[in-house]
Amino acid sequence: MKTPVRALLITGFAVACAGPSADVTLGAAGPWNEGYGAMNKRGIDLAIEEINANRGVRGRPLRLLARDDGADGAKAAAIALEFVQNPAISAVVGHVNSSTMVAAAKIYDGALPAIATTATSPDLTGISPWVFRVIASDSATGVELGRFARRLGHTRAAILYENDSYGRGLADAFRRSFDGTIVSIDPIPSGNGDYEPYIAFLKTQSPGLVFVAGTEESGMAILREARKQQFSVDFLGGDGWTGIVGEPAAQGAYVGAPFTASDERQEAQRFVAAFKARYGMTPDGNAALAYDATKMLAKVIEEVGPDRTAIRDYLAGLNERRAYRGVTGVIRFQPNGDPVGKTVVIARVNRGELTVAGSR
């Protein structure tokens, strides 16, 4: 099957370079019905609305072809092939999940530039010179979270992780960086599963902190179960937890977030105000990163046009002077596609908001 697929990719790429359409078009893929996916989509849509309200890109409307990959690798690969073969699409915003981006990257390689929004797996580092991301890798984030847990004064920690690219990578980085005793490491089901036995077991291990490498859905369920069993320890999650703020049981939990709405920088506050006005809610890191990726691609196309190779080359060649200055910070890329200098903000859930946390 390898030869026919490669032939299709080459054919699709050749067609895509044949000439521009009347509009400039971006592809986007993610699990739009999930909480974090919906936030990604809102960030993308807001960016496009603002761009089109300001003469579009090169005086032409910026359009979006969005596809729902359901956080499924096979669907993501099929969507990637569709995007590659569509001559109107100049670049892709997404994918959102690590596993779907890994699957899609093999299709985009050599054919279509893509900027992952919230895909953090170390497996993406260097996967293709056509794939970039605007969020730090788990290998960097997990180290920061492990060190933060130690700064909180904890010497005993437990780890729960979703058994996928994201969960495994983040959990391993935390484990390696936590300068204390790891009392247990356990894989957990994704989604709104039954976490009663996990919390019951953790209570027998007496950790001071539980690190959870998973998404907001499993995170909220775990925190509810911990409250139910009166298991009062510190909980810490990665960027997958940025959407847990509305859960009452999340009060006091720590989150390694790529962005917080309390960021006082002018560009960040402009984005927060615009997002609240448009959607009636506070944006999280998912929305901010997707917004930045979309605005960044629009700026690149404004500079070099809709040609795919020109876009890829411009992204790869960004230096400190030409770096994109977005709501999540300054963005340029290492040769392996990871962002330069991107870090996480350690925040704490406080009455439905994320506020920057300090060590105690």
Can you describe what each PLM-predicted range is?
Residues 2-13, 17-360:
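Extracytosolic ligand-binding ectodomains
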